[in-house]
Protein backbone atom coordinates (compact mmCIF):
# COMPACT_ATOMS: atom_id res chain seq x y z
CA UNK A 1 0.00 0.00 0.00
CA UNK A 2 1.44 3.39 -1.05
CA UNK A 3 0.74 5.92 1.72
CA UNK A 4 2.77 8.88 0.40
CA UNK A 5 4.76 9.39 -2.77
CA UNK A 6 7.68 7.00 -2.59
CA UNK A 7 6.52 5.47 0.72
CA UNK A 8 4.89 2.06 0.93
CA UNK A 9 3.95 -0.14 3.87
CA UNK A 10 2.74 -3.68 4.32
CA UNK A 11 1.46 -5.88 7.11
CA UNK A 12 1.50 -9.66 6.79
CA UNK A 13 0.13 -12.27 9.15
CA UNK A 14 0.39 -16.03 8.79
CA UNK A 15 -0.57 -18.94 10.99
CA UNK A 16 -0.20 -22.70 10.84
CA UNK A 17 -2.44 -24.99 12.87
CA UNK A 18 -1.84 -28.70 13.32
CA UNK A 19 -4.02 -31.14 15.23
CA UNK A 20 -3.21 -34.84 15.03
CA UNK A 21 -5.01 -37.68 16.80
CA UNK A 22 -3.44 -41.13 16.52
CA UNK A 23 -4.95 -44.36 17.84
CA UNK A 24 -3.46 -47.83 17.83
CA UNK A 25 -5.11 -51.01 19.10
CA UNK A 26 -3.69 -54.52 19.46
CA UNK A 27 -6.16 -57.31 20.10
CA UNK A 28 -5.50 -60.62 21.77
CA UNK A 29 -6.08 -63.36 19.18
CA UNK A 30 -6.63 -66.92 20.38
CA UNK A 31 -5.72 -69.83 18.06
CA UNK A 32 -7.54 -73.19 18.14
CA UNK A 33 -7.16 -76.67 16.66
CA UNK A 34 -9.96 -76.74 14.06
CA UNK A 35 -11.17 -80.29 14.71
CA UNK A 36 -11.23 -80.23 18.50
CA UNK A 37 -11.45 -76.50 19.28
CA UNK A 38 -8.54 -77.01 21.63
CA UNK A 39 -6.98 -73.62 22.46
CA UNK A 40 -3.41 -73.00 21.41
CA UNK A 41 -1.07 -70.22 22.44
CA UNK A 42 -2.48 -66.75 21.72
CA UNK A 43 -0.71 -64.29 19.44
CA UNK A 44 -0.25 -61.86 22.33
CA UNK A 45 -0.55 -62.02 26.08
CA UNK A 46 -3.00 -59.13 26.35
CA UNK A 47 -4.92 -56.58 24.33
CA UNK A 48 -3.99 -52.91 24.42
CA UNK A 49 -4.92 -49.49 23.10
CA UNK A 50 -2.86 -46.30 22.87
CA UNK A 51 -3.69 -42.76 21.87
CA UNK A 52 -1.58 -39.69 21.05
CA UNK A 53 -2.93 -36.16 20.68
CA UNK A 54 -0.64 -33.52 19.11
CA UNK A 55 -1.57 -29.84 18.90
CA UNK A 56 0.68 -27.16 17.39
CA UNK A 57 0.11 -23.44 16.82
CA UNK A 58 2.55 -21.28 14.82
CA UNK A 59 2.05 -17.57 14.14
CA UNK A 60 4.06 -14.94 12.29
CA UNK A 61 3.54 -11.20 11.83
CA UNK A 62 5.55 -8.77 9.69
CA UNK A 63 5.24 -4.97 9.57
CA UNK A 64 7.46 -3.22 7.02
CA UNK A 65 7.83 0.24 5.51
CA UNK A 66 9.81 1.33 2.42
CA UNK A 67 10.75 4.79 1.20
CA UNK A 68 12.54 5.55 -2.05
CA UNK A 69 13.50 8.89 -3.55
CA UNK A 70 15.48 9.87 -6.63
CA UNK A 71 16.99 13.31 -7.14
CA UNK A 72 19.29 13.83 -10.07
CA UNK A 73 21.72 10.93 -10.28
CA UNK A 74 21.14 9.97 -6.65
CA UNK A 75 18.72 7.29 -5.45
CA UNK A 76 18.08 6.54 -1.78
CA UNK A 77 16.04 3.60 -0.52
CA UNK A 78 15.17 3.19 3.17
CA UNK A 79 13.56 0.12 4.72
CA UNK A 80 12.50 -0.54 8.32
CA UNK A 81 10.43 -3.30 9.83
CA UNK A 82 9.38 -5.46 12.74
CA UNK A 83 8.61 -9.17 12.84
CA UNK A 84 7.63 -11.70 15.44
CA UNK A 85 7.01 -15.42 15.32
CA UNK A 86 5.98 -17.78 18.05
CA UNK A 87 5.17 -21.45 18.32
CA UNK A 88 3.34 -23.56 20.91
CA UNK A 89 3.26 -27.36 20.90
CA UNK A 90 1.35 -29.75 23.19
CA UNK A 91 1.50 -33.56 23.16
CA UNK A 92 -0.47 -36.07 25.25
CA UNK A 93 0.01 -39.86 25.30
CA UNK A 94 -2.13 -42.48 27.04
CA UNK A 95 -2.40 -46.26 26.92
CA UNK A 96 -4.40 -49.08 28.56
CA UNK A 97 -4.27 -52.88 28.55
CA UNK A 98 -6.74 -55.75 28.96
CA UNK A 99 -9.67 -54.37 26.96
CA UNK A 100 -13.12 -55.49 28.09
CA UNK A 101 -14.07 -55.78 24.41
CA UNK A 102 -12.16 -55.57 21.15
CA UNK A 103 -15.08 -53.62 19.69
CA UNK A 104 -14.63 -50.69 22.07
CA UNK A 105 -11.96 -48.45 20.55
CA UNK A 106 -11.65 -46.06 23.50
CA UNK A 107 -9.19 -45.76 26.38
CA UNK A 108 -11.86 -46.48 28.98
CA UNK A 109 -12.17 -50.01 27.58
CA UNK A 110 -8.80 -50.85 29.15
CA UNK A 111 -8.78 -52.18 32.69
CA UNK A 112 -5.06 -52.58 33.46
CA UNK A 113 -1.76 -50.73 33.25
CA UNK A 114 -2.84 -47.12 32.96
CA UNK A 115 0.02 -45.08 31.46
CA UNK A 116 -0.17 -41.36 30.78
CA UNK A 117 2.38 -38.72 29.88
CA UNK A 118 2.49 -35.38 28.17
CA UNK A 119 4.75 -32.51 27.23
CA UNK A 120 4.50 -28.91 26.16
CA UNK A 121 6.98 -26.47 24.68
CA UNK A 122 6.96 -23.00 23.21
CA UNK A 123 9.37 -20.51 21.69
CA UNK A 124 9.29 -16.99 20.27
CA UNK A 125 11.51 -14.71 18.19
CA UNK A 126 11.12 -10.92 17.96
CA UNK A 127 13.11 -8.86 15.45
CA UNK A 128 13.61 -5.29 14.34
CA UNK A 129 15.53 -4.50 11.15
CA UNK A 130 16.52 -1.66 8.87
CA UNK A 131 18.37 -1.09 5.61
CA UNK A 132 19.78 1.88 3.69
CA UNK A 133 20.62 1.71 -0.02
CA UNK A 134 22.38 4.49 -1.92
CA UNK A 135 22.93 4.51 -5.67
CA UNK A 136 24.82 7.18 -7.61
CA UNK A 137 24.34 7.13 -11.35
CA UNK A 138 23.95 3.33 -11.26
CA UNK A 139 27.73 3.15 -10.83
CA UNK A 140 28.51 3.52 -7.14
CA UNK A 141 26.39 1.44 -4.78
CA UNK A 142 26.29 1.38 -1.00
CA UNK A 143 24.19 -0.70 1.39
CA UNK A 144 24.02 -0.91 5.20
CA UNK A 145 21.86 -3.30 7.24
CA UNK A 146 21.14 -3.67 10.93
CA UNK A 147 18.88 -6.12 12.72
CA UNK A 148 18.23 -6.77 16.38
CA UNK A 149 16.80 -10.11 17.48
CA UNK A 150 15.36 -11.31 20.79
CA UNK A 151 15.10 -15.08 21.29
CA UNK A 152 13.18 -16.90 24.03
CA UNK A 153 15.83 -19.64 23.93
CA UNK A 154 18.21 -17.53 26.02
CA UNK A 155 18.14 -16.04 29.51
CA UNK A 156 16.36 -12.62 29.62
CA UNK A 157 19.73 -10.94 30.29
CA UNK A 158 21.25 -12.41 27.11
CA UNK A 159 18.36 -12.68 24.65
CA UNK A 160 19.28 -9.80 22.38
CA UNK A 161 21.76 -9.77 19.53
CA UNK A 162 22.83 -7.07 17.04
CA UNK A 163 23.79 -8.16 13.53
CA UNK A 164 25.06 -5.43 11.18
CA UNK A 165 26.30 -5.68 7.61
CA UNK A 166 27.65 -3.23 5.06
CA UNK A 167 28.66 -3.40 1.41
CA UNK A 168 30.00 -1.12 -1.33
CA UNK A 169 30.15 -1.79 -5.05
CA UNK A 170 31.54 -0.18 -8.17
CA UNK A 171 29.96 -0.96 -11.53
CA UNK A 172 33.06 -0.35 -13.59
CA UNK A 173 31.24 -1.39 -16.76
CA UNK A 174 29.27 1.90 -16.56
CA UNK A 175 32.41 4.03 -16.70
CA UNK A 176 33.12 5.88 -19.94
CA UNK A 177 36.49 4.19 -20.40
CA UNK A 178 34.65 0.82 -20.57
CA UNK A 179 32.33 1.97 -23.33
CA UNK A 180 34.04 -0.07 -26.03
CA UNK A 181 33.56 -3.33 -24.12
CA UNK A 182 29.80 -3.06 -23.54
CA UNK A 183 29.00 -5.16 -26.59
CA UNK A 184 30.49 -8.22 -24.89
CA UNK A 185 30.92 -7.10 -21.25
CA UNK A 186 27.82 -5.19 -20.23
CA UNK A 187 27.88 -5.68 -16.46
CA UNK A 188 31.16 -5.82 -14.52
CA UNK A 189 31.00 -4.98 -10.84
CA UNK A 190 33.49 -5.05 -7.97
CA UNK A 191 31.90 -5.53 -4.57
CA UNK A 192 33.25 -5.51 -1.02
CA UNK A 193 31.08 -6.53 1.92
CA UNK A 194 31.20 -7.41 5.60
CA UNK A 195 28.42 -8.67 7.82
CA UNK A 196 27.34 -10.91 10.68
CA UNK A 197 24.47 -13.33 11.16
CA UNK A 198 23.10 -14.89 14.32
CA UNK A 199 22.37 -18.52 15.10
CA UNK A 200 19.93 -19.21 17.94
CA UNK A 201 19.57 -22.97 17.58
CA UNK A 202 20.85 -25.04 20.50
CA UNK A 203 20.37 -28.59 21.77
CA UNK A 204 17.09 -27.61 23.49
CA UNK A 205 14.56 -24.81 23.65
CA UNK A 206 15.56 -23.81 27.19
CA UNK A 207 19.33 -24.31 27.58
CA UNK A 208 19.52 -21.62 30.28
CA UNK A 209 17.15 -23.56 32.56
CA UNK A 210 17.89 -26.73 34.54
CA UNK A 211 15.02 -29.11 33.79
CA UNK A 212 13.79 -31.84 36.14
CA UNK A 213 11.74 -35.01 35.70
CA UNK A 214 10.14 -37.59 38.01
CA UNK A 215 12.00 -40.84 38.66
CA UNK A 216 11.88 -43.97 40.81
CA UNK A 217 15.51 -44.94 40.12
CA UNK A 218 16.76 -44.04 43.57
CA UNK A 219 17.89 -45.90 46.66
CA UNK A 220 14.96 -47.44 48.57
CA UNK A 221 13.85 -45.55 51.66
CA UNK A 222 12.47 -47.72 54.47
CA UNK A 223 12.58 -50.76 52.23
CA UNK A 224 10.35 -49.28 49.52
CA UNK A 225 10.89 -47.39 46.28
CA UNK A 226 10.01 -43.70 46.59
CA UNK A 227 9.19 -41.32 43.78
CA UNK A 228 11.46 -38.30 43.47
CA UNK A 229 12.55 -35.57 41.07
CA UNK A 230 15.93 -35.42 39.38
CA UNK A 231 17.76 -32.89 37.24
CA UNK A 232 18.20 -34.28 33.73
CA UNK A 233 20.19 -31.47 32.12
CA UNK A 234 22.77 -28.87 33.05
CA UNK A 235 21.96 -25.21 32.54
CA UNK A 236 23.95 -22.27 31.21
CA UNK A 237 22.35 -18.88 31.82
CA UNK A 238 25.13 -17.14 29.86
CA UNK A 239 24.53 -18.94 26.58
CA UNK A 240 23.56 -16.51 23.82
CA UNK A 241 23.64 -15.96 20.07
CA UNK A 242 26.32 -17.55 17.94
CA UNK A 243 27.70 -14.88 15.62
CA UNK A 244 28.59 -16.06 12.14
Walk through the language-model features, giving the residues of each.
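Short amphipathic helix-turn modules centered on a small-residue break
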Residues: 28-30
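Extracellular/periplasmic, surface-exposed regions of secreted and cell-surface proteins
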Residues: 1-26, 39-244
Amino acid sequence: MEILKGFTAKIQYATRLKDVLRKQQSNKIQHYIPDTDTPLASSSTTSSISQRDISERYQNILVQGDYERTFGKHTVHLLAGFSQEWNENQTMNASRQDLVSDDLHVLNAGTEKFDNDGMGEEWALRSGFGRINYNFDDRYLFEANLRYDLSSRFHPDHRGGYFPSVSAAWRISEETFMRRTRSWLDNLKFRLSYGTLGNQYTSSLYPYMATIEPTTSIMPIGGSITSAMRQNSASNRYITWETI
